[in-house]
């Protein structure tokens, strides 16, 4: 916030005439400049809409509704700009400039969305500029989330520290040429923000007091949880916190055999008696979901009876279950169905959603994420979601969250659970990392979060369709129809539920693909996914649009080996030589991820 703030002025052509309105506008621009703002002008609605959707750093918007000019634009265009702003930011002040239009004549939608109505001749330019400055100051006070706001405020006070860390706000680095390079690279703000735990205004992360607690409660609201804990060791640590917080020695627990090693560690340390659900696998080697029938009480009891670990357990009734959602290749459970089944056997269900922190923020994932399980589900267990916030959202690496949806069926004492949290914590947390979790959560709040996810999924769909289109055109244009290109793990055709029409994936409308989960559902009787019909019945399994698996020639979904192929490692090596880093390499697959940080240039 130390950089100069700027105001976006979207108005019909000014500065080229000598009209009274033109001169009044120029005087207002000068007065705003005297308040310390830069005024960025655009004269067309197209440019204005482009700016408000591409650069969110403006502090306020001045929007011309009916100002005279050579290319005055329609009221409808101004309304589109207002909608474009509010689609991303519901707090930034919008000042509507109108010479002739009375407030009573404005559409109600406009009246609800604008901050103030400016008549250029009603007050002096200096007074209007002062009103604008007041609105901007109020906006910036409310803009920042709790922890980052206090960290910024503390740093601005330039307090002397006689506490750890020893670099003392980066000063130590300035005493050595190597340290100076380090300081130059990371910058003073980051180093000054690396503070000791004795900085009282910043509260206590371990005790959830002050700004850290305020931030966690804000994140809980945003993500739909009752409690949220910020974890600074990644989801590997978060998984262990959950396990250590709820599992007792010799408890029987139900675990996805595809679970992360951190869950195995938590089971080992707690002395749990694990009984494993076996997931599926297709011909590409992709690990799929655990079929729904394997979560049934009958199958659970069968697994417990067969397991040597169940002998001498405290009870033959399991106390906890853990499931990986989504899989590493982007296959998502119908979580509501999973919980409905597991609720018949366990009072606690833990979903490892390390790569899936964004699911709440787009309707295509409805029923498919942990914190979305209905509160009124009969006998609902306590639900735990572990997310690597840094993986797919905008937190620093190692930033993670534990979200908890409480249940009377399995009461959880906050202080007792916090002991497990503190066991994996530190009295020397990295404050910028906490701030990044605070900011990552705030960015996903409405309306910006859903908009970011809409854009992310739109980019992923564009990439998918482009790849499918290239492959299709190469086959059509080749002499023998045998030309090849890399494939994408997705259906070749989708069905519009409104019309029943079957459409090539690359020809489908964006709106259809972005709003219709059945376009991404794995259906029985289709060859492209490679899973058995009985394991994916109904809408149980859905492919995540944001996780894109590129298929190399050499094997198909049924595991049939071709005469020739290109292993995934070869493609990865090629891309690496072009400075393109991908997420994961399989035998004949390469995974790329679309997140809120993906650029269209990629």
Predicted feature residues:
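Conserved C-terminal alpha-helix-loop-beta "cap" of PLP-dependent enzymes
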Residues: 457-602
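Two-component/phosphorelay signaling modules centered on CheY-like receiver
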Residues: 12-41
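Conserved PLP-binding active-site segment in aminotransferase class I/II-type PLP enzymes
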Residues: 122-208
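Conserved PLP-enzyme active-site core in the AAT-like
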Residues: 42-45, 51-54, 68, 107, ...
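Conserved N-terminal alpha-helix of the aminotransferase class I/II PLP-enzyme fold
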Residues: 188-237
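Output/docking surface of receiver
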Residues: 41-43, 74, 98-103, 107-134
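Short, flexible/disordered intra-domain loops and linkers
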Residues: 14-23, 68-77, 284-294, 363-368, ...
């Amino acid at each position: 916030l130390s950089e100069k703030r700027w105001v976006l002025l979207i108005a019909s052509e000014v500065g080229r005439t000598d009209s009274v309105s033109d001169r009044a506008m120029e005087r207002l621009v000068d007065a705003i400049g005297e308040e310390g703002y830069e005024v960025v002008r655009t004269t067309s609605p197209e440019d204005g809409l482009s700016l408000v959707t591409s650069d969110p750093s403006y502090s306020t918007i001045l929007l011309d509704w009916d100002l005279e000019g050579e290319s005055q634009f329609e009221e409808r265009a101004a309304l589109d700009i207002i909608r474009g702003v509010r689609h991303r930011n519901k707090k930034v002040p919008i000042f509507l400039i109108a010479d002739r239009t009375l407030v009573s004549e404005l559409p109600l939608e406009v009246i609800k969305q604008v901050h103030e109505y400016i008549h250029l001749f009603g007050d002096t330019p200096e007074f209007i500029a002062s009103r604008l400055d007041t609105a901007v100051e109020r906006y910036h006070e409310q803009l920042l989330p709790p922890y980052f706001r206090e960290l910024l405020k503390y740093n601005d006070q330039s307090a002397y520290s006689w506490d750890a860390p020893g670099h003392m706000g980066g000063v130590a680095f300035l005493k050595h040429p190597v340290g100076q390079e380090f300081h130059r690279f990371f910058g003073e703000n980051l180093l000054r923000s690396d503070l000791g735990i004795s900085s009282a205004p910043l509260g206590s992360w371990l005790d959830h007091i002050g700004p850290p607690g305020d931030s966690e409660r804000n994140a809980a609201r945003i993500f739909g949880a009752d409690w949220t804990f910020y974890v600074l060791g990644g989801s590997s640590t978060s998984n262990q916190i959950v396990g250590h917080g709820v599992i007792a020695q010799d408890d029987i627990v139900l675990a996805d055999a595809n679970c992360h090693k951190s869950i195995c560690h938590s089971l080992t340390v707690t002395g749990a008696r694990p009984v494993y659900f076996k997931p599926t696998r297709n011909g590409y080697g992709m690990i799929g979901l655990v079929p729904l029938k394997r979560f049934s009480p009958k199958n659970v009891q069968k697994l417990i009876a067969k397991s040597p670990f169940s002998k001498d357990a405290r009870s033959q009734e399991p106390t906890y279950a853990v499931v990986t959602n989504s899989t590493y290749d982007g296959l998502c459970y119908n979580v509501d169905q999973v919980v409905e089944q597991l609720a018949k056997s366990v009072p606690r269900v833990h979903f490892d959603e390390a790569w899936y922190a964004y699911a709440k923020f787009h309707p295509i994932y409805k029923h498919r994420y942990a914190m979305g399980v209905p509160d009124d589900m009969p006998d609902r267990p306590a639900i735990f979601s572990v997310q690597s916030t840094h993986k797919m959202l905008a937190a620093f690496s190692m930033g993670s969250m534990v979200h908890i949806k409480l249940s009377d069926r399995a009461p959880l004492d906050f202080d007792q659970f916090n002991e497990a949290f503190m066991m994996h914590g530190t009295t020397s947390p990295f404050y910028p990392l906490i701030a990044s979790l605070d900011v990552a959560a705030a960015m996903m709040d409405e309306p910006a979060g859903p908009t970011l996810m809409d854009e992310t999924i739109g980019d992923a769909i564009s990439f998918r369709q482009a790849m499918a289109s290239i492959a299709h055109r190469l086959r059509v244009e080749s002499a023998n129809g045998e030309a090849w290109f890399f494939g994408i793990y997705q259906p070749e055709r989708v069905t519009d539920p409104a019309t029943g029409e079957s459409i090539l994936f690359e020809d489908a409308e964006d709106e259809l693909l972005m709003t219709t989960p059945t376009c991404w559902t794995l259906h029985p009787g289709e060859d492209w996914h490679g899973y058995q019909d009985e394991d994916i019945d109904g809408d149980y399994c859905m492919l995540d649009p944001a996780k894109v698996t590129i298929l190399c020639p050499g094997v198909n979904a049924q595991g049939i080996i071709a005469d020739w192929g290109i292993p995934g490692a070869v493609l990865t090596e090629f891309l690496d030589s072009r400075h393109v880093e991908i997420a994961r390499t399989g035998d004949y697959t390469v995974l790329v991820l679309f997140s809120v940080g993906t650029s269209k240039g990629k």
